[in-house]
């Protein structure tokens, strides 16, 4: 078999086709065979040369989507906003970039240790970006002076691992109650991120992620937790 002279183009084509199918058919309904059938003659072997699985494709697609729409890049061009306002812009921009079906699928993958570890690493990196903006806010008076590093890390852990969580499963009412609790914590630290407008965005995120309204979800556990004996 001749070697592929353009591996990067092949990988890009697989990602483009996969994103199109995920959005049209849904992630769960799209199979590897569906992706291969839409690659214009490329084989299943070509797919597995670049990606280990459909889950691997989804992870890479999500990384590309959020890199293309990275609000931390565009915030550098914003003029006249203080540090707190910039953080709110980043937060709302990130929320508006969510693809509901893809994000729900990605959340389900966080039950797998490999993807959870990657999410933790991403959260660590994002906290560093928020730390810079928090320092700016502390300098301009929009955020109470304190430890910017700890505040950024705490905020990311609460929002990324407790509110939006593959471990602590919530229904809609509890999701909002958690957001209010986070608001109380951050307000107490002089970081008034979750104002009325941001709380509306939190509510929209809950809808986008498909957070259920019934209470049955409160008894559910992630797959790795079910393996732990009582």
Model segments located where?
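Generic hydrophobic, amphipathic alpha-helix propensity
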Residues: 10-18, 35, 61-65, 69, ...
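Helix-turn-helix
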Residues: 13, 21-56, 60
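Hydrophobic alpha-helical connector segments
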Residues: 60, 71-104, 117, 152-155
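All-alpha amphipathic helical-bundle segments outside canonical DNA-binding/catalytic cores
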Residues: 84-85, 121-122, 139-154, 172-178
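Short, well-structured alpha-helical segments
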Residues: 88, 131, 135, 148-156, ...
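Short secondary-structure transition hinges
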Residues: 95-143, 149-150
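C-terminal peripheral helix-coil segments that are non-catalytic and often amphipathic
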Residues: 132, 171-230
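Membrane-embedded alpha-helical segments of multi-pass transporters/permeases
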Residues: 162-165
């Amino acid at each position: 078999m001749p070697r592929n002279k353009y591996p990067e183009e092949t990988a890009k084509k697989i990602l483009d086709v996969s994103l199109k199918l995920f959005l049209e058919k849904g992630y769960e309904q799209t199979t590897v065979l569906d992706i291969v059938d839409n690659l214009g003659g490329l084989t299943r072997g070509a797919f597995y040369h670049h990606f280990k699985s459909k889950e691997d494709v989804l992870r890479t697609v999500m990384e590309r989507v959020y890199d293309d729409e990275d609000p931390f890049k565009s915030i550098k061009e914003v003029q006249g906003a203080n540090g707190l306002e910039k953080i709110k812009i980043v937060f709302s921009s990130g929320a508006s970039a969510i693809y509901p079906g893809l994000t729900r699928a990605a959340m389900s993958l966080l039950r797998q240790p490999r993807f959870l570890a990657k999410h933790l690493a991403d959260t660590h990196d994002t906290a560093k970006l928020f730390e810079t903006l928090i320092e700016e806010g502390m300098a301009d008076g929009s955020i109470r002076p304190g430890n910017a590093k700890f505040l950024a890390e705490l905020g990311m852990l609460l929002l990324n691992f407790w509110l939006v969580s593959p471990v602590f499963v919530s229904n809609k009412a509890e999701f909002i109650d958690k957001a209010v609790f986070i608001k109380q914590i951050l307000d107490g630290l002089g970081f008034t991120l979750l104002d009325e407008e941001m709380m509306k965005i939190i509510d929209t995120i809950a809808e986008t992620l498909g957070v259920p309204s019934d209470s049955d979800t409160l008894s559910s556990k992630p797959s790795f937790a079910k393996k732990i004996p009582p």
